[in-house]
Amino acid sequence: MTTLTISIIVVFVLGYALIATESLTKVNKAAIALLMLVGCWTLYMMDPMQYLQLMHPDYTGGAAGMVEKVTGIIQEHLGDTGTTLFFLMGAMTIVEIVDQNGGFNWVRKVMKTKSKRALLWRIAILTFFLSAILDNLTTSIVMIMILRKLVTDHKDRMVYASLVIIAANSGGAFSPIGDVTTIMLWNKGLITAAGVIAEIFIPSVVSMVIPALILQTMLKGELVMPEVSDQQNASVSDFTEGQRKAVFWLGVGGLIFVPIFKSITHLPPFVGILLVLGVLWTATEVFYRGLHRGADTEGTQKRVTKLLSRVDMSTILFFLGILMAVSCLAEIGVLTALGQGLNVVFDGNHYLVTGIIGVLSSIVDNVPLVAGCMGMYPVAAAGDMAVDGVFWQLLAYCAGVGGSMLIIGSAAGVVVMGLEKITFGWYMKHISWIAFVGYIAGIVCYWFIRTFLYAI
């Protein structure tokens, strides 16, 4: 490992440490993430040829075409990152439109309960199954908006929000469209929809239920429900009940339609999100036109053109910085070397290898980790490495559920961290060990099913 490679790793680790101690340094994590991005890629450009020869052995352009090649690599990573960012912005805007126009009012009525523990289980179950249909990112945004309607105490809401992260990641792990890593494995033909649902569903449930059982001990007594009328809660008082329900179903139904749109058109998911946003935007404009509002009324402040300013840009920039910094680690070969090293150290024990990969996925982005594994391990005709084999199914589970162990270990965690202002330190102290217990329990459950039930 060269000095330059070590320097890049040091910059990443230092930035990661500063993000982890945001509550102490009082420096916004988005600023640190952007500095990580620039620092890692600037060091990379000091001697890119060694990395081109390592990661792109087919490159024959020499020094003359080096800059052009690296520029293309960065643009490719930026394109991949951009699809995530546009998806995030679109989903956040859609949920904001539904929320501000009273679309979640009736959901609030359905979820309403005075018992803190009863609400915890309703939130857990709804998040789990919604994440399997949508994705953990969109589900987390929707559930946080619903929680804000139900829970006024921020300390209690942090507990609920933490369970949203765990349930969203667990729910996405057993569904071929629930998480970006399962989508990758499914599209590559390494797992089948029927196989991953049949064998990962129960471990995923276990990884959610056990943390929920522990977390409910942190919640005692009854909720103080926010006393807000439907008209106040809707923000736009002149919207009828039918219009509010239309906004809800166009928004949430549209989000459910996104994976269907992707499977039909084979376009990236962000295109489907933009389609839903366009349809919902048009519908609300038609509703407003029928209200004949003046330009300065309160209701017009809730139109999409006004709501766009409410999108949390610091979260978007944080995503940009983290994903691009991790892509630099991928380009210097660190992630691939790490995966190969795990296989050697643990002598091909796939439970240990995938288990460690799951832990690592809570530290760095799980996408390059899974991509590295897909490139390192060939598909076998039979055995653990076959389609729907132990390795690939455990990889889907571990890469998805493992991200719950740290709040910045998954897209769901990062979004909830930004929306609810949960610090890295608080989550690590109170939630990480709980998520880890659920994670291990799910692996043990999978081992039991494969070893005993499938052996019958």
Regions inferred by a protein language model and the residue ranges of each:
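Hydrophobic alpha-helical transmembrane segments
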Residues: 9, 34-35, 85, 120-125, ...
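Transmembrane helical segments that form the transport core of multi-pass membrane transport proteins
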Residues: 60, 79, 101, 108-110, ...
